[in-house]
Each structure stands twice: as structure tokens, then as C-alpha cells.
Regions:
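C-terminal accessory/tail domains of diverse enzymes
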Residues: 1, 10-14, 31, 191, ...
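ATP/Mg2+-dependent ligation/transfer catalytic cores
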Residues: 1-170, 195, 339
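A generic structural motif
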Residues: 13-15, 91-97, 146, 186-192, ...
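Short, hydrophobic beta-strand segments
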Residues: 86-92, 180-187, 233
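Core alpha/beta catalytic barrel or barrel-like domain that forms the active/cofactor pocket
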Residues: 121-133, 164-184, 214-231, 271-279
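Accessory "access/gating" subregions that flank catalytic or transport cores
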Residues: 154-168, 182-189, 200, 204-214, ...
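Loop-centered beta-sheet repeat module
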Residues: 193-201, 206-217, 225-235
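Acidic/histidine-rich catalytic neighborhood
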Residues: 227-251
Length: 339
């Protein structure tokens, strides 16, 4: 019997959606080097059935070239084929990243950061989402009942995310009705964004298989609880040491960290245009929303744009190792590559 498995070549666009083309499994090896063509006007797609004004029209094409290290294959369902996909680079002739490739943006930014500071950027994203069409009535926030009501979903999701190797750390109920949160372990550079992209798609797939829909929208209801995609990050030197903290300095932050925070606070309105890019994003942001109320920073302040997160350890070495910052504005309408 011919294997009917389809492998998806996927890429993250400007509105946080994963676009794709597919190839039969038998064609995969032949397509790995040069990928598949894609009309560049596709990058002007919104979440709705229209295109934003763009200079391309029907002209030009890029290649969506799969990144071998991002292979993800989830095979946990008896009644559905494996969920098999790769993340892609958008490339022009000669194997160079297209100027509008979101993955290329992040690669360039990380290279610039390392060139200027000599450091690597380490990050981890939190994923808040609502389970839509859950047939079980909502239980009180943060309770065991809330988790056990969706035990089949969380079991499948945990199994699938473990297969996806994204460093799953926590699965928990959240404050909103049918709201949950998943966190991934920190990773260096591109890997952090790739883990986030893969995690979201796997979570969506697990919900689909059970007749539900996982919504990462910043607000499902204008007056409801919001979903964020908070980014925890730190700076690492060539030896792997976390250099974000300097005990004894203000808030135990290193000079570089203080400068970085100052830059983020100063440019927060422009940063929000990239990290919270949709109209619905601004139903989530604001004072008393436990998201971002102000262009400010603070130690364990969940309404500041930048939250300083000291380590819970009392061991001096662990305190330095665990020290990190949290950018609280981002949501899932932005590509993790751009955040």
C-alpha cells in the first residue's frame, strides 16, 4: 500500500499564522534542498480573506526551504495520520534569505546583537490559550477540576509536545474560563522562536483531534481575560554563563541589562507595533489588565513592560544563573521570529 503521509513545509508570517505547502512523504528527500515555490504576495495575507496593499502583485517568487533541524513528526493518534512538518527559510536565488523572511529577520538581529555585545540571547516563551468548544462547563480558575475536565487533551498535548522535543516545562490552568498555559524551557537564539512556533501548532492539532479549537487570540471576548505570549530572556557569554545579573548593582542587574531595559522602555510604543500588532491586541494591554499598563520596568511587576525576575534560589551562584527579564507585551498575533 502506498504511504499517504503528507509532509508540510511551513513558515511563520507577519500576522503570526503558519502558512504551508505539502509534499507526499515519498517526495520529501527530493524537495529538501530547494523546497517549494511561493508567490511573494502571499506575505501580504492577513488573517482574513484579503491581501494588504503590496508592491508585488502576481510578480516574483521565493523558495520555502525546509530546515532539517526543525523536523517535527507527531504520531500519537489511532484515527489520524501523523502531523509531520518542517519550518522553512524563505529564500531567493543563490540560497539567500528573502528580505521579508521572518526567520531571516531574527537571524540578522541575533547576529547584530552578538557582534555588538559578544553575547547570545537566551529566551523562552509562555503560551496562554483558550480551549473553544469545550463541552464541559468552565470550573473555577486554577483548580484541579479545571485540569481534570480536560485530562484527555492535556495528556495528548503533553505526549505530543514531548515528541516535538520543545522542552516542555509546565502545563497549568489559567485565570480565564477554559484558559490554559504551557511553557517551554529556555533555548539560545533561533531555537527559542522555533520552539514557540512548533508548540502552538502542536497544541492546536491536539485540540482539533478532540473537536475543540485552541485560540491564542489576545482577547477572545473584548471584556474577557487576555492571552499573552510573554518572553523570558537573558544574556549568555561564550562560556554559557548568564551575565544578565550583577549582584550589588541596582536591582542586581548588570550594566548591559540596565541599558537594555532603558532602551526597551524608551522605544516601547514602536516595540508594541511589532509584538502586539493587531487591533485586538490593545483590548488586552492597559492598566488593571495584568498585561502591560505602562512603558516601565519593575521587579516582579506584572503590569510593567519589562518585569525583572530574580531567581527563587538562595544560593548565590543559582541566583545569578536564574536571573532573567520578561517582556510582557507580546501576543500570538505576532510571529515569534519578530518578537
Amino acid at each position: 500500500m502506498t504511504n499517504g503521509e503528507i509532509v508540510l513545509f511551513t513558515w511563520s508570517d507577519y500576522v503570526g499564522l503558519m502558512r504551508c505547502r505539502g509534499v507526499p512523504l515519498a517526495e520529501l528527500d527530493r524537495r529538501m534542498e530547494h523546497g517549494l515555490g511561493w508567490a511573494v504576495a502571499g506575505q501580504a495575507q492577513s488573517p482574513f480573506p484579503d491581501l494588504a496593499p503590496n508592491p508585488w502583485g502576481p510578480m516574483m517568487e521565493v523558495r520555502q526551504v525546509p530546515i532539517a533541524s526543525t523536523k517535527t513528526r507527531i504520531d500519537i493518534w489511532d484515527d489520524a495520520p501523523p502531523f509531520h512538518f518542517y519550518l522553512c527559510d524563505s529564500q531567493v536565488s543563490g540560497g539567500k534569505n528573502w528580505d521579508c523572511c521572518t526567520r531571516g529577520f531574527l537571524k540578522s538581529a541575533l547576529e547584530d546583537f552578538k557582534s555588538e555585545t559578544g553575547l547570545d540571547f537566551v529566551a523562552a516563551l509562555e503560551h496562554e490559550f483558550m480551549l473553544m468548544d469545550d463541552p464541559v462547563p468552565a470550573a473555577p480558575s486554577f483548580t484541579v477540576e479545571t485540569m481534570r475536565n480536560v485530562a484527555k487533551f492535556t495528556q495528548d498535548m503533553t505526549y505530543a509536545l514531548t515528541q516535538a522535543n520543545i522542552g516542555l516545562e509546565t502545563v497549568e490552568p489559567e485565570f480565564g474560563e477554559h484558559q490554559y498555559e504551557v511553557t517551554c524551557a529556555p533555548a539560545v537564539g533561533l531555537a527559542a522562536a522555533e520552539r514557540a512556533i512548533i508548540a502552538r501548532e502542536v497544541i492546536r492539532e491536539c485540540a482539533r483531534r478532540l473537536g475543540m479549537r485552541a485560540s491564542f487570540s489576545p482577547k477572545v471576548k473584548a471584556d474577557g481575560i487576555g492571552n499573552g505570549a510573554h518572553v523570558h530572556f537573558s544574556f549568555q557569554d561564550s562560556s554559557g554563563k548568564n551575565v544578565t545579573s550583577h549582584p550589588g548593582e541596582k536591582h542586581d542587574a548588570s550594566l548591559l541589562t540596565q541599558q537594555f531595559i532603558a532602551g526597551v522602555v524608551r522605544h516601547m510604543p514602536a516595540i508594541c507595533a511589532l509584538t502586539s500588532p493587531s487591533p485586538v491586541s490593545y483590548f488586552r494591554l492597559g492598566p488593571q489588565h495584568w498585561s502591560v499598563g505602562y512603558a516601565s520596568f519593575g521587579v516582579q511587576n506584572r503590569e510593567a513592560a519589562i518585569r525583572i525576575c530574580p531567581s527563587p534560589s538562595m544560593d548565590p551562584a543559582e541566583m545569578v544563573r536564574g536571573y532573567n527579564l520578561e517582556l510582557r507585551a507580546p501576543d500570538a498575533t505576532a510571529s515569534p521570529y519578530i518578537v
